[in-house]
């Protein structure tokens, strides 16, 4: 898998507060549908982590397509080897994913941890989080990049005291060949998306040509 590049662009000052809405793009829906299947999800996990697990029942699903937190619909969240993995699909480039995932992981930890145990002298163990974004938008990015929560901090001095890293994997056709090779379903999804874009482009061109011809005929009729 390609070496990740860090994205440390500082967010511009913006005090406008908007309520986030759940993304209902067809690409996201197809991704959730395909990888809500345990067998497909395990194949994707093995491809990303270069592992070879065989039993899909080892996946403990935390949330699936109906999980919405602050208007954010995540795609797939599950526990494997006591680690919590959050897999999300994005069809548009979004530098705010680390902040969104911070909201989400805090919500999940609240569900997993007994609040009373936080006041005891015993250390409360929690699953280590892992954040993966599968990106297939039109904005060109490398095969593997990183988005960091600290990029959003204003007037940051020294090392950040809080950090969250989202690994972004480009799953457009022609990217991450090794990853695609080890997960046939992901490869087929990328091919389907490429074909859908091609088909949509062709349909738009046909509609445009028909409109142009119709306009020409109307103009010609007026001149006769």
Locate predicted features.
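Elongated, amphipathic alpha-helical interaction scaffolds
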Residues: 2-224
């Amino acid at each position: 898998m390609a070496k990740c590049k860090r994205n440390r662009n500082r967010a511009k000052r913006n005090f406008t507060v908007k309520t986030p809405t759940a993304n209902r793009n067809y690409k996201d829906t197809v991704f959730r549908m395909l990888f809500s299947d345990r067998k497909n999800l395990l194949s994707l996990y093995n491809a990303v982590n270069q592992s070879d697990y065989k039993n899909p029942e080892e996946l403990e699903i935390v949330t699936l397509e109906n999980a919405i937190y602050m208007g954010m619909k995540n795609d797939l969240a599950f526990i494997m080897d006591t680690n919590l993995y959050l897999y999300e699909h994005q069809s548009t480039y979004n530098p705010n994913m680390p902040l969104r995932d911070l909201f989400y992981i805090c919500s999940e930890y609240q569900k997993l941890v007994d609040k009373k145990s936080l006041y005891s002298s015993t250390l409360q163990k929690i699953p280590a989080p892992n954040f993966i974004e599968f990106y297939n938008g039109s904005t060109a990015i490398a095969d593997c990049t990183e988005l960091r929560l600290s990029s959003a901090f204003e007037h940051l001095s020294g090392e950040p005291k809080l950090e969250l890293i989202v690994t972004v994997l480009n799953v457009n056709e022609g990217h991450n060949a090794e990853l695609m090779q080890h997960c046939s379903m992901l490869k087929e999804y990328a091919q389907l998306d490429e074909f859908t874009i091609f088909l949509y482009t062709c349909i738009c061109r046909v509609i445009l040509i028909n409109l142009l011809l119709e306009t020409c005929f109307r103009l010609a009729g007026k001149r006769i």
